[in-house]
Structures are given as structure tokens and as C-alpha cells.
Amino acid sequence: MSKIQIEQLSKRFVKRDKYIEALKDITLTIKQGEFVCLLGPSGCGKTTLLRILANLEKPSTGDVIINQTDKKKPLQSMVFQENGVIPWLTVEENVAFGLKMRHLSNDFVKERTEYYLQKVGLSKFRRLYPKELSGGMKQRVSIARAFANDPEILLMDEPFAALDEQNKFILQEELLAIWQETRKTVLFITHSIDEALLLSDRILLMSAQPGKIIKDVAIEMNRPRSIEKVRSDPEMTKIFLDIWEQLQSEVKQTRLK
Ligand SMILES: Nc1ncnc2c1ncn2[C@@H]1O[C@H](COP(=O)(O)OP(=O)(O)OP(=O)(O)O)[C@@H](O)[C@H]1O
């Protein structure tokens, strides 16, 4: 069943007296429960596409349809690279925030909050404020909140980009464990091919500006995956090199513009 349908989408921005063609003719279907990573050179329009899906930006032309199965659920939740937590709320209050806004029963909010705090290993830090947390802990709060909201789709914009390698691997595996349980439809932006290979059912590669989808690769490796398995698998190495070459050529084009 299709969860997200994008038809002939283009986006132009006006900057001073010039047009910037950020996205061009994007047509795409994402299935219910699919984990899709979006890769592409800097400035190719990845965040713009995510913002359109989050209804923070309107397409210039074309349509976006998110297939809503439950009207009581939010359509989407977003996780950003940084600053996604509310500084004056505790860890627990941050995770519960979306649920409280929907006026759900206190017992339900408490149970869901507790569940996701445990999933990301933050139960004993529940009373801390964001300024008392490390970068990795803050991202865990954002992930817990996004999943606790139980949205129709999850939009993640380089959520691990600011973390050190070790923390990144741990959070990637935690995210996969929660995703495998919930089977949310996820659209995840990354600059890392390794990250995309580890996480995705499918990788979409975008061209240099104006952003178009130039490659759509199914990643069929069995789950659960680990970075060690991904790096030692010959098929994954082949896909890595293929995407690497194409990405390099798109990055070079960006530099020539
Ligand atoms: N509100 C805006 N007004 C004008 N131009 C914009 C606006 N938002 C984005 N752009 C332009 O649209 C293009 C795509 O930007 P976007 O942030 O979507 O790219 P990106 O692929 O996410 O980049 P990065 O990988 O560096 O985060 C860029 O040229 C950017 O300058």
C-alpha cells in the first residue's frame, strides 16, 4: 500500500530578483512501512522536499498525498539535526509533549512516554533539562518524542550528523530496533552512504540542483543489520561504489555551477 505519493513536484524559490529551481519533476511512491533514505549533494533540495512533506513549505507545482489511515494521529513528525528539543521542558516532558497537545488521557501519555524513554535508555535521566544532556542524549529525546507521537510518517533530517562515530552507530541501531517494532514509514536524509545502506529498504539518490531523483536502489540485505555486516557484504560494497561514483559526479557538477 502506498503511504506517500509525490506527483510531478517542482519547487522554485525567489531569491532577490532571481529564481532558484530547487526541485524539478519529482514523482515518487513510498510504501507503508518503508524506510527510505535520501542522498544527494549539498543544496540539491533534500530538506526542501522534507519540508514540503511536513507542510512547512508549499510545492510550486505538483502534488503530495500522504495516505492517512487514522484521523486522530498526526500526519508527520520531524527529527532535525540539532535543536529539536524544547529547552525549558525536562526529558520526560519533551517526550510527552506531542501526546499532551492532543489531550490524550494522562495514563496513556504516561505509559507511552515511559515506553519510549526506556527504548532509548533515558528513563533515569527523565528529570534532566536539555542543557544537562549530551548531543546523543538530545537526539534520543527527539527520536523518542517522534515515535511516541505515533505519526503516519516520520521525517528525519540528518538526525545523527552532529554526533561522533561511536554515538552515531549506537543511535542508528537503536533507531532500527524501534523502527522494526513500529514499522513506521520513514524518510531519512543523510550525507553518509554507509548510514543509508545500514538503515534503508530503499535509497533515493538526488541530482545536483535542480534536485531530481536519479537513482532508486532497493537494499535487500536481511535485517537486523550492523555496520560490520554492511561493510563486509560484497553486494553492499558494489552498491556503495556505484552510489559513490554517481554522488561524486553530482558534487563536481555543483562545484562547476
Ligand atoms: N526559503 C528559501 N528561500 C530561498 N532559497 C531557498 C530557501 N530554502 C532553500 N532554498 C534554496 O534551495 C536549494 C535547496 O536547499 P535545501 O536546503 O533543500 O538543500 P539540501 O539538499 O537539504 O542541502 P544540504 O545537504 O546542504 O542541507 C538551495 O539552493 C537553497 O539555497
Q: Where are the language model's segments positioned?
A:
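Short helical segment in ABC ATPase nucleotide-binding domains corresponding to the A-loop/adjacent helical element
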Residues: 92-100, 110, 114, 218
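Catalytic Walker B motif of ABC-type/P-loop ATPase nucleotide-binding domains
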Residues: 154-157
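Conserved signature/switch motifs of ABC ATPase nucleotide-binding domains
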Residues: 128-131, 149
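Helix-to-loop junction immediately C-terminal to a conserved catalytic motif
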Residues: 54
